UniProtKB/Swiss-Prot annotation:
This protein's name: NADH-quinone oxidoreductase subunit D
Location in the cell: Cell inner membrane
PROSITE patterns linked to this entry: COMPLEX1_49K
Pfam families per UniProt: Complex1_49kDa
Organism per entry: Acidovorax sp. (strain JS42)
InterPro entries linked to this entry: NADH_Q_OxRdtase_suD, NADH_UbQ_OxRdtase_49kDa_CS, NDH1_su_D/H, NiFe-Hase_large
Superkingdom, taxonomy of origin: Bacteria
Gene of this entry: nuoD
Matches recorded under SUPFAM superfamilies: HydB/Nqo4-like
NCBIfam families with a match to the protein in the record: NuoD, PRK06075.1
Enzyme Commission (EC) number: 7.1.1.-
Record key words, sorted: Cell inner membrane, Cell membrane, Membrane, NAD, Quinone, Translocase, Transport, Ubiquinone
Amino acid sequence: MAEIKNYSLNFGPQHPAAHGVLRLVLELDGEVVQRADPHIGLLHRATEKLAEHKTYIQSLPYMDRLDYVSMMCNEQAYCLAIEKMLGIEVPLRAKYIRTMFGEITRLLNHLMWLGSHGNDCGSSTILIYTFREREDLFDMYEAVSGARMHAAYFRPGGVYRDLPDSMAQYKVSKIKNAKAIEELNRNRQGSLLDFIDDFTQRFPKCVDEYETLLTDNRIWKQRTVGIGVVPAERALNLGMTGPMLRGSGIAWDLRKKQPYDAYDRVDFDVPVGVTGDSYDRYLVRVQEMRESNRIIKQCVDWLRANPGPVITDNHKIAPPSREAMKSNMEELIHHFKLFTEGFRVPAGEAYAAVEHPKGEFGIYMVSDGANKPYRLKIRAPGFAHLATLDEMARGHMLADAVAIIGTMDIVFGEIDR
């Protein structure tokens, strides 16, 4: 009888579990994965090259579109790199606002990850639950920037504007009656800080709901326990960061080890796993959501008690306020020059990294003294994680490959750049 050879299977890029445009060429022995070869580049948009032909401010909106699930964290790294090269000091209130929105972004990312990962493994209920909370978080984005996703809110030297004193209200429509609208507007009567404070009080119960659905669910455990195990030393050697590294038991978190913005002023714990499997990474991310909620609450309390400026007073970098621009011709000219010609950055280089929801997101920037970068290099955490897929999936079943892709939390905007 002829020997049955391995066969190849093309997975994606249209597959719903591919999380974007991943194409995997899988070599299978029956249903067991022998080799996994990820093909990337289908979402390549030349962001690094585009940045060389734009001023520093004009490149900022491109950052939102890298990891398009963790928008403000990308902006944060970019602004930190520019501030490091300019040597400017960011007002403390702006640091707290950045820290707060960095954690709001972490919640946005982890909720998206939890919903889609649960859905990949067969629990479609969790997807609906997590998207319910994401709506409130998007409303926070919209309140400060006018955009629900690609905010472009952070600026070199601070943030675009201070937090608003009121929240937008829902109006009665054909879809929702007056009673439903009144319930939706119940927690929108005060300022944005009041709205965020209300969310932080409600959110722990929501996380409890997610854990009720999954943590002790025997099907969820069968799909994640012992799947994609990465020992601690191997995780370090493979360049893993963020929850992927902490899931293997290494307490490495840039917010603690190399604090930026206001992270050295807030109190939080770094959750770590034990075995380094998909289940541990799930537990780490769920606990991270609870810790992020703690940080947001501390930021809200501080911001309420401490008014102040939210952007540097260096007018070569910071644009004038919208109010001044509309009433004063000099301010209008200042605004126009800043957004068309930009500002010049002294020759040199800088690397700034943030504890992005997916891992260490870094920006390496080289300046030749012009108004645009000579070179911009983006260190995407998902790139290193996707490279480990072959090692993590080998010997597992085809269905487990989907769970492993899910546990990595990959987004192709940052991987392909």
